[in-house]
């Protein structure tokens, strides 16, 4: 949007960066060229890898299937604890992989037998045009589109972006505005707005992830408040993943998150009536597995990303018939925990 002073205001995310000719926004990948904002990384990737869908993490979306994952560079948040900082803070585009058109990516996913493509490693909101074009090309081949995102998107852009997505994992980094301001240079409310939008105004399957950082966002008081908001606004059936922090980027002074902390968070969330609460980044079979909210039967056993016992039939518990929220196929996938880096040129 052109402003009276001659600057252009980018309307993609809540930062609403105001830039002069040649300047870039906070994300560094969107640049003013003439009278418009241009995505400078369109068609460029930081690399492609076939992963288990559970790694996104998505536990209730096509379990056991493979997903073709990729990202670009840059980010519209400034998280001091970023676990993918080498990608999200990249400024040298020549280090990105070879160019990849949406059609090439869709064809590669099809030839690799992937049921979905994930926009991940850095936030797809900042490369929305590219992500949308890839999602549309994939849809033509029956392949789903997954966004792994912090949910930091403006009201103007939210509907357009998510109407092209089939699933998402949204990163709820904390439940205080102070945390977002101090450690992410952002705000909490736009993320909460995205979560409510996904739940009440779309058919996008989504799950939520919170990285628990010792001493920053893991207090009982904050976890109780977050869980109460979650139950009231999103309901009991949206999965929530509590994952372990490791020291990285500009936050090297904090210890690793303990399994006990993750278990405590899981118990608090479940005490508020949430049905599907998981732990991640640690070896915890109980915390990673899905149990029936109706009878307590083990439905999907997970050991890291390996699936074990499976007691679902037509999306229902085999023991009591309780319908399990999610997107399930008649048979579970068999990709297992494999990680397969790929070069698109060798496939397409």
Model-identified regions with their sequence ranges:
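Short, cysteine/histidine-rich loop/knuckle motifs that typically chelate Zn2+
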Residues: 12, 26-29, 74-77, 81, ...
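Generic structural "secondary-structure junction" signal
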Residues: 10, 19, 28-29, 40-44, ...
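Auxiliary Fe-S-binding modules of radical SAM enzymes
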Residues: 1-21, 215-348
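Iron-sulfur (Fe-S) cluster-binding segments and ferredoxin-like electron-carrier domains
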Residues: 16-40, 84-94, 299-305, 324-331
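Conserved AdoMet/S-adenosylmethionine-binding subsite of the radical SAM
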Residues: 99-260, 265
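A generic "binding-loop/recognition-motif" signal
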Residues: 23, 75, 176
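Conserved Radical SAM active-site core
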Residues: 32-167, 336-343
